[in-house]
């Protein structure tokens, strides 16, 4: 693995990450050029990490106790982003089936969304759940989905109510909407536009919709090194972590770049906070899983029964 380091752009980074912290390589060999490792998700009550191996159509499990990776599920419809709802159920964005699903506590699978206004979704990419139970997800249009009369012709960001009864289109002018994350107070929703190389930010209205007039570029993450904005997470103090050119960038809540985690693997695809204290930062890349430690806990995902 090439040189690994944590770069400080601003002294404020020292409160967030120790620049001498080790960046660990945990596993590799996933997906390769055909499709990346993606969607890391910490399963708190069981103490393991799930992640997607998209090309191999598998969900994998990393056990930090034994430091081993094992097959968790074979046959995922090439799922990408993962999260949990308020009951601790697994929510997955499935590429091949072009839908969002929920794994029930009894092991059955529920399709929670597969169309908008009678037209099939494109390829749902990433997903996050708000504290009121609403599910927000991105659905980029990609060239393999040649449009026909039943297809959507735009990339969308959506909000689905907890009862699954109302699906609202929030934004439709992204080139490729990808990772998304809320600020700690859920007053702001950050959404990547991967093709444009930046993160956009929207104020969230009391009804859960986005204030379109508040749309702004939060930060531009283009650069000469490999990598584009992809998966994204936020810590409890509002600092934003996102893959970009050359590694994982850390921004404060104003969008100021504080530093970069250069982990040596090409193209960071997604990140997740985990560990008992939510201070372990896991990341996936094209075919690699790694981690480092941070000083400020990430926003936890909901936790179910053990």
Where are these regions (language model features)?
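A short loop-to-beta-strand structural motif that recurs across blades of beta-propeller domains
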Residues: 58-60, 99-101, 155-158, 198-200, ...
